[in-house]
Each structure stands twice: as C-alpha cells, then as structure tokens.
Amino acid sequence: MGQIDFSTITTAFTDPAAWLVAPIVLVVLFVVLLRPRRPGARGEAAVARRLRRYCAAVANDVILRDGRGGLTQIDHLALTSEGLLVVETKDFGGLIFGKTHDRTWTQCIGRHKRRFENPLRQNYGHVKAVQAVVPEVQVTGLVVFMDRARFPRGLPEGVTTLSLLQQALPLTNAKSIHAAHREAWDTVISHVLTDRLSRDAHLVIARRRKRGS
C-alpha cells in the first residue's frame, strides 16, 4: 500500500502562488455554478447546432441597432443559398394556438393558459433590422419551436419545429453561396454590437417592454 506524500500537500498550502490563485478559482466556480441560466438558452443551443449543420455560417445572440434609435436581439442569424435567415427560437411546450396576423398567441398546459407575443411579429422586427443593414439581399425569417410544442390547428407559415427544421431550410453548401450573399453576411456581422454596455442596454429595454405588455 502506497504512502501519502505529505510534503506535497504541505507545499501546496505554503506556496504563496497557490494562495493567490485559489481565490480566483473559487470566484470563477461560484459564478459558473450559480449564474442563472437565461430562459430558452437550452432550446437556442439545440437550434444553433442544427443551423451549423445545414447552413454556410451561423451567428448566435446577435444584437443590432433597430434603425429607430433602439436595439434588437436576434437568436440566430444564418447564411444560406437564398440569402440571410433570421431565426427566433421558442423553447415552449404544451399546446400552441395562434395565427399569422394575431397580436398574441396562447400556450396551454393542462388548465393553465398564457398569452405571449406573436413570435412572427416579434421576428419581423428582427428581419427589418437586418434589411436596414443590407437592403440589397433577401432576408427571411423563421420561428422554431421545440418538439414539446404542439399545434392542434397546424403550423402557421414561417413556423417550424426543431425536428422539422432541416425541411424548412434551403439546400445549402459552400459552392451554393452567392458572392453578394457572402458580402452581405460580412457586412451584417461587422454591424453586430458586442460590447457589454450595448447588451446591458438591450436587457433594460426588453424588461421595460415586458412590464408594459
């Protein structure tokens, strides 16, 4: 049976460098373990993986200026053979009722009902923000629900589920990307706001809108 080398343990506790690093490690672990998960993050991650598989390029959690003095947050932006695709992910379950032009849709889980903003209308604003940057190329929108969601009256146009996502996407490969589409993609990416201040500002705006809805 091997003997424990207590000298190694003693060195670890007496080494000044170890005492300097230890608090940093503890803080990082604390932040990672206790940081609240953003609502819908798991669903967005699942959609992002599918998009990377079937699209030429994908950017996630994109923040752009909306052209009206504000900011807009896009779950996913993808480059396809037909142009740019703006994707809104909804990690909802239960029965979903809503039509294309309704202001709000309804989620039903058992006896509980909850109204939420029509995601097609919500994503339309995202599409317009991208079009403002690259008006010369086609920009389309798509809303993706998780497979836990059911649509008793059928999927509205422009809406799909995770398992049907591939069927809703245009066939795309590296050779099918037009140079103008690639240039438009690069232009939009160059307009993406990545600084923390912009992201914090968007969160404040989103919370105000939620309180006012």
What do these predicted regions represent?
Residues 96, 100:
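Polar interaction faces of repeat-based domains
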Residues 90:
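Ligand/cofactor pocket segment of small-molecule handling proteins
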Residues 1-72, 79-84, 93, 104, ...:
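Surface-exposed interaction regions that form or flank ligand-binding interfaces
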